[in-house]
Amino acid sequence: MAMVEMQTTAALAESRRKMQARRRLKNRIALTLSMATMAFGLFWLIWILMSTITRGIDGMSLALFTEMTPPPNTEGGGLANALAGSGLLILWATVFGTPLGIMAGIYLAEYGRKSWLAEVIRFINDILLSAPSIVVGLFVYTIVVAQMEHFSGWAGVIALALLQVPIVIRTTENMLKLVPYSLREAAYALGTPKWKMISAITLKASVSGIMTGILLAIARIAGETAPLLFTALSNQFWSTDMMQPIANLPVTIFKFAMSPFAEWQQLAWAGVLIITLCVLLLNILARVVFAKNKHG
């Protein structure tokens, strides 16, 4: 009887060792595949960044920020008008899109919650979040540009704002939902009106998270080309008239990169480097703001 028990124990131990060996093998295979996939993705990311830096750094100069876009096959010149135009488009898109997104997020988190209207808004917002930017550009072209019968900076602002609003809505709603409900109950117990509770308590508690969403939304629209091709188009001259086509960096990069002129291509690489650095800085700033809110 003792011999049978010893054999059974030995068989169980051997079975356990084989099972553990198989698990270790599967774990090594999964880890190797994960590391290989990560290395593959990082390789291309680093390659793209290095190509952008090495090719774009040659075109960086003071003239890039002070001179206008040059005529074809002409040395010198810069991207001053394109940079100014992009700044105007992003500024106005943020001015119009951010308040709308914040107010919609407040409604979803504080007023609508699970109402049918809130569900409809969330559904539409999810569609806008996943919609290709060129679809938004075509939509604005149909309802604005085609009706006005000319391209304009305001059409570009509308397109960029439509891309920005869904991000701000989602971030605002999520940040407000993270505020403990006990704070709301305490405010109600003191007789605080709902609008006062929202402005003085929930918004104040989630302001860093909302700011993070706004920064990410700005980074999202900073390099968009497709919607601007159908709305603001471009302008090779210095112009701040939002009722007319206005120069902007993404479309200028697209135009110069597709050209056969080496001077334009060099400016295009410099423009790509500027956009890359701006988006990188915005993402870093967003992470810093969010981390400060999380640990502060």
Curated annotation (Swiss-Prot):
Keyword Iron set for record: no
Domain ABC transmembrane type-1: 83-286
Membrane topology: Multi-pass membrane protein
Keyword vocabulary terms for this entry: Cell inner membrane, Cell membrane, Membrane, Phosphate transport, Transmembrane, Transmembrane helix, Transport
CDD domains on file: TM_PBP2
Residue ranges annotated as Periplasmic topological domain: 51-82, 147-150, 224-266
Record-level Gene Ontology MF annotations: phosphate transmembrane transporter activity
Function: Part of the binding-protein-dependent transport system for phosphate; probably responsible for the translocation of the substrate across the membrane.
NCBIfam families, per database record: 3a0107s02c (TIGR00974), PRK11268.1 (NF008430)
Protein family per UniProt: Belongs to the binding-protein-dependent transport system permease family. CysTW subfamily.
Name of protein: Phosphate transport system permease protein PstA
Species: Escherichia coli (strain K12)
